[in-house]
Amino acid sequence: MDPSVTLWQFLLQLLREQGNGHIISWTSRDGGEFKLVDAEEVARLWGLRKNKTNMNYDKLSRALRYYYDKNIIRKVSGQKFVYKFVSYPEVAGCSTEDCPPQPEVSVTSAIAMAPATVHAGPGDTATGKPGTPKGAGMTGQGGLARSSRNEYMRSGLYSTFTIQSLQPQPQPPIPPRPASVLPNTTPAGVPAPASGSRSTSPNPLEACLEAEEAGLPLQVILTPPEAPNQKSEELSLDPSFGHPQPPEVKVEGPKEELEAARAGGFSSEAVKAEPEVSASEGLLARLPAILTENTAQVCGLSTSTTEITQPQKGRKPRDLELPLSPSLLGGQGPERTPGSGTSSGLQAPGPALTPSLLPTHTLTPVLLTPSSLPPSIHFWSTLSPIAPRSPAKLSFQFPSSGSAQVHIPSISVDGLSTPVVLSPGPQKP
């Protein structure tokens, strides 16, 4: 037998043969049911056909499950080794004695469940196989197998892909239908551009024509590149437009101010220096009041000996007085230091060297009010037990800067004989 025969064809051939009743037999020819009387023998014969010596019923049953999905063979539930042809195939060349009644089986199978027959062609029967004339001269066993194999391959039962591939083939006449519709639309659109291409109908030809017409003005505009520049220059020179004028007004404004400033004899640097001068003038304006308060405090403290005994911290305020000496002594330095040199100029604010007036001078750059400080500073200075390291420095710490301070350098070391001052005084190294 031909090895290309499928399993269901092999079983059907066994059922057609009269001498195979002991291994396979019909249980219901009308329903297409058959039973594997000797399932192992049927499997062995199927193995011989496929050249597989190790074939058994387990492998045969798994092969039959493949036809479950193809809707060719179905297992009858509740009965062992009983199967049923769902779509009973017609084998060409079989005689009426060997073949079961085909019309009855085909009708019952078509009524029961035969979705493959729905996809069959006009020449197909309920089996889904193309109809072939019986007795076409193919009496040979190999010829029957080949024809059945080829017919099965061409039928829709072999694979669903063949059905899907055969369906688009009869559809070529369908594309001419849109083609016939297109000529109807194109003639309607052809006269429209001829009469007036500006019509509102959204035809592709009109859109293309409009795009071409729209491209022509672009070429005309690009040919004279100097025209836009002239127009822009005219727009900039034209006084009717207000956009270019504001920059001119903004530019002319500062120029007029600079010219007016130059005409008046003031430069931009002088204008910038005015706030600084005003700030320095404000400081100088307040300095007399601060200095008068300082001198008044010095006069009040000159009677006590503690004012003279506090020059120990004199060296620390010198660093603080260096940046302040040029600004604080800008106009009053010569009055306070009439005959002193550079060293006396740095030590000119004598009251700042005492702890009583040190906080006031450190606060003057911050422009804080020193009016509330003198009472507390006065008590702190009278109660401070700090004594100078050497009394010889007293004459250099307080140069004569006013009539109120004339008595300060005249005080000698004997004036330090108060018990409050002499307790820590000369004993320090």
Swiss-Prot record:
* Composition skew (Pro residues), residue ranges: 169-178
Which positions are linked by Glycyl lysine isopeptide (Lys-Gly) (interchain with G-Cter in SUMO)? K231, K250, K255
Q: Where in the cell is it found?
A: Nucleus
Biological processes annotated in GO? cellular response to gamma radiation; cellular response to testosterone stimulus; gene expression; hippocampal neuron apoptotic process; liver development; lung development; positive regulation of DNA-templated transcription; positive regulation of transcription by RNA polymerase II
Region Sufficient for interaction with MAD2L2, annotated ranges: 350-400
Residues modified to Phosphothreonine: T337, T354, T364, T369, T418
Q: What does the UniProt record tell us about how this protein is modified after translation?
A: Sumoylation represses transcriptional activator activity as it results in recruitment of HDAC2 to target gene promoters which leads to decreased histone acetylation and reduced transactivator activity. It also regulates nuclear retention. On mitogenic stimulation, phosphorylated on C-terminal serine and threonine residues by MAPK1 but also MAPK8 and/or MAPK9. Phosphorylation leads to loss of sumoylation and restores transcriptional activator activity. Phosphorylated and activated by CaMK4, MAPK11, MAPK12 and MAPK14. Upon bFGF stimulus, phosphorylated by PAK1. Phosphorylated by PRP4K at Thr-418; phosphorylation activation ELK1 transcriptional activity.
Q: Which residues carry this modification: Phosphoserine?
A: S325, S384, S390, S423
Indicate, by first and last residue, each region the UniProt record lists as having compositional bias (Polar residues). 302-312
What family does the Swiss-Prot or TrEMBL record give for this protein?
Belongs to the ETS family.
Q: What is this protein called?
A: ETS domain-containing protein Elk-1
Please tell me the species this chain comes from: Mus musculus
